[in-house]
Each structure stands twice: as structure tokens, then as C-alpha cells.
Amino acid sequence: MRPPPFNPEIRRALRIDVSAALLFAVFASVTTPFIGLILRRELGATPLQLSVMSAAGGACLLLSLAWARALGGRPPLPYLVWPSFVARGLFLLAPLASSAWSLVSLVVAANVFGAAAGPAQAAVVERLYPRAARGRALGLVRMAGAALGIGLALAAGQLFERVDYRVIFPGAAVLGMAASLRQRHLPVPAAAGAGEPTVGGLRQAWAAVRDDDVFRRLLVASFLFGAGCWIQTPAHPLLLVDVLHVSAAQVGVFAATAAAATLVGSAWWGGLVDRRSSLDALWMMYLVGAATPAICALAWDPWVLVASSVTDALVGVGLDLVWMVVVIDIAGPARAAQYVAIGATLAGVRGILGPLLGGLLIGALGVRAVYLMAVALMTAAAWLVVREPARRAVVYSGSW
């Protein structure tokens, strides 16, 4: 059955959201895929420095409950726009990052402000897009960015072979900041009724987890899957540079392939969460995620990583889209920001421990052992979601 067309309010929001996504795609395409490569190849970052950067990025998420509490019942849009504006603007300082530690510090600072926008993003999405169209709307936004990212990634790979990152990153920062400013025009409705309640602190978060059996079980699965993701982070630059000797041009090809996969995945995941239980989409996403470390563990040639780029991109857009819809479905409008903050806080815990554990595994058993451990953790997460009793229900906000 063909889904109904978007109403005028959704179309208006999509015009703004898509234009912001296009600007952000330029920023992301010439920064994120190349940070690890620059740190290892050009600045000689050690496994310890790579682990510290990843763990610090996770530690930033520990502040999620504080950010959600600061949001409270206030309009969420400013809490989305301005932290992301600062996070992207920090890349203007790239010309000052002449050592591994200085670039690591810049990335960590950007992660602090980026994490601050997480709870507000969930609140904006919940208000902006009705549940029946939420998956398709978010998928369309991601598709727009991915379509532009295909060509950008290929060009960026060649650009980094010719131009210093200290020149490229500030230019990207300007466009990233413009994307944040564009989001200021999103027509976010006011909260229904008296507005969203105060999120509270750790005690209220513990009460929410204790009282919601479904959410608690999904947090366990999410923790296993996320741990599998995080332990890989210090291994990726080492696999690229030391094991497979990947060039910047090849990284550009991988990123372009990932953008193409994101284009397809955005449409598929978005349609799936609107047609079926969002938990069905979640376990499928977790299984696809387990394929990425499996491919990396077996990779014998740089071009094998094209396949892992596809699966990693499918999971990346799935984590962004499917998990947000799952949490909003479970929480309902009043608790969406709190539930997102709880999930992000636990992501911070595994984000600290995962990279450090990954670094220890690399030292003891080698790079590929990390990927085998990740496969086991991520497969276990998928199994837990498959066994979830609530999975068979078609989930809509407030249905539990």
C-alpha cells in the first residue's frame, strides 16, 4: 500500500530540514572520514592517543542527563541549534592543531557540544514529524545528505592528497555552522498541554529504567551493541594505516560508497519503521552491524573495506533513525528527551570503557582480535531484541 503524501506542515519542515542536511553533508564529508587517517598518518598518533580520543568522546555523553535537565520544558530548538553551531565552529581552530594531542583535544571539545544537542534533537523530531510519517520524513532528510555526500567524498579523498587539512577543516566548519543556523527556521510546534515535565537527575533516571521493563531490556541490548561499536574505534586507524596501508584517495572511495549506502538505507529504514514494529527494524540493524567487524577481521586488501563501508553506513543511518524512533515510541512525547538522555548516558559509559578495552586487546592479541570480540557482542544484542516480547507489536508513541 502506497503511503499517503506529506501534509503541507511536514513539507514545509522538510524543505528547511533538507537544506540544513545538505549543508551539514559537506561539513561531515570532509571531516569525519579523515580524522583518524590524519591523526595516524600525518601526526603520528599512538594507539593510546586514539583510544583516549574515542573514550573522551564517550565521556561527553555522560553529561546527557544534565543537558536534558537543562532543556526541561523549554522550547527545544535553541538547545539543538547552538550547541551544534559551536561544535562545528571549533573546526575553525584546525590551523592551530599541529600535533596529535592538539587535534584530539579539538575533536573532544567538538564532541562535548555535539552531545549536548542529543536530547533536544529527539524533542524536536517528536514535535516536528507525526509518528505515522516520522520514519519516511527522517529517511528523506538523510537521503538528501547522502546523495550529496557521494560525490563530495570522492572529491574530498583527492583534495586531502593535495591540500593540508588545516585549510580544509575551517572551510568545512563554515558550512557546518550555516547548517545549524538554517535549523533555526524549523517550524517546531509548542508542546501539547502543559509542556514536557522536568527530566530530573540520576534518581529519576533510575526510576524510569526500573519501572519500564521493555526499556530496561532494550538498554541491555543497546549496551552490548554499543560496546561492540566502541571497542573498534582505536583499531580502525591502525587497520587502515598500519595493516592495509590505505591512501586518502581510497578513504574517499570508502566514504562515497558509504554515502551511497546511506542513500538506500535511509529510505529502507524509514519505510520499515513506519510499516512495522520499530523493534523489528532494530534487530535487523544490529545484525547488519555485526557484519562490519566480521569483514574487517577478514580484510586482506584495502578494497575489501568497500563492503564494510556499506554495512557500517547502513548501521550509521539506522542508529540515527531507528533507535530514535524506538526510544520515542517507548517513551511517548512527555519522556522522549529523558529516555534519549538515559540511553546516551549509558553510551557514555561504554564509550569510555570500550576504546580502552579495545586498546588493551590490540596490545595483547592484535588488531583483528578486536573485531572478533565486536562480532560476538553485536550478535548477542540482536538475539536479545529478537527475544523481546514487545517486538511483535506495531509500536506507536504512547502505545505501551
Question: What residue ranges belong to the model's regions?
Answer:
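C-terminal membrane-cytosol helix-exit motif in multi-pass small-molecule transporters
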Residues: A173-A192, A381-P389
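Helix-loop junctions at membrane interfaces in 12-TM secondary transporters
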Residues: A94-V107, A297-S309
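Transmembrane alpha-helix termini and helix-breaking/packing motifs in multi-pass membrane transporters
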Residues: L37, R41, R69, G73, ...
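Juxtamembrane intracellular "pre-TM" segments in multi-pass secondary transporters
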Residues: M1-R11, V188-V220, W400
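Intracellular juxtamembrane helix-capping segments at the cytosolic ends
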Residues: A116-Y129, G318-G332
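Helix-loop boundary and gating motifs at the non-cytosolic
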Residues: R2-L62, V214-F254
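Helix-to-loop junctions at the C-terminal end of transmembrane segments
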Residues: L63-P76, F160, V264-S277, I362
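Structural signature of the two symmetry-related core transmembrane helices
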Residues: P78-L93, P170-A173, D280-I295, L372-V375
